[in-house]
């Protein structure tokens, strides 16, 4: 690792506490790495707003990333209004009273089950005919030993398993 003094540009005594401090140069260097991956692979890399929703930095981030991932209405709205670009929305269960706005804001909506897809796809087509729909796949592979944090644990309802997948 490169040793450097992060306080050259920052006087910690001037920051309110608690604070989130972001080194913009480091952020941009990381974004350049992600952009190089996109260019080499043809993949689109999206900002996961669940992990980083500091919209102050969205103008910088959108120079490099194609859009955002949203986990519901509020994140979809934030991505649409503040980031621009693509908005991909996923939720384990969409709420009927929110879905019209989610559909209007999102270019891609991923459903957790075939029943959710069947229920909401007509509304997605009604409110945003150009939006794409998908199904979350449960990979049935775990990297954690703690069941509580394992989306692939037995009887998990997060995504469709291979045994329950239907080709349509």
Predicted regions, residues:
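Generic N-terminal amphipathic, Lys/Arg-enriched alpha-helix
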Residues: 2-20
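Short amphipathic alpha-helical surface micro-motifs
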Residues: 2-4, 28-30, 116-117, 140
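N-terminal glycine-rich anion-binding loops that anchor highly charged ligand groups
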Residues: 3-7, 31-33, 39-49
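Generic signal for short, ordered secondary-structure residues
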Residues: 5-6, 13, 40, 58, ...
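A short alpha-helix capping/helix-coil boundary motif
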Residues: 11-15, 35-38, 53-57, 147-148
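A glycine-/small-polar-enriched, mobile loop at the entrance of the PLP active site in fold-type I
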Residues: 15-24, 43-47
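Alpha-helical packing segments of well-folded alpha/beta enzyme cores
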Residues: 27-30, 34, 168
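Active-site-proximal beta-alpha core segment in soluble small-molecule metabolic enzymes
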Residues: 43-168
């Amino acid at each position: 690792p490169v040793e450097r003094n992060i306080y050259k540009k920052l006087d910690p005594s001037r920051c309110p506490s608690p604070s989130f401090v972001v080194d913009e140069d480091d952020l941009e260097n990381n974004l350049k790495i992600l952009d190089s991956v996109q260019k080499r692979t043809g993949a689109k890399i999206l900002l996961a707003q669940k992990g980083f929703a500091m919209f102050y930095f969205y103008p910088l981030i959108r120079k490099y990333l194609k859009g955002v991932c949203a986990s519901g209405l509020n994140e979809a709205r934030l991505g649409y209004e503040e980031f621009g670009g693509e908005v991909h929305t996923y939720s384990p269960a969409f709420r009927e009273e929110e879905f019209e706005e989610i559909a209007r804001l999102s270019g891609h909506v991923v459903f957790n089950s075939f029943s959710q897809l069947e229920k909401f796809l007509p509304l997605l087509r009604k409110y945003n005919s150009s939006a794409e729909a998908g199904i979350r796949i449960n990979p049935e592979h775990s990297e954690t030993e703690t069941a509580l944090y394992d989306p692939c644990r037995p009887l998990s309802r997060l995504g469709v398993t291979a045994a329950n997948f239907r080709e349509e």
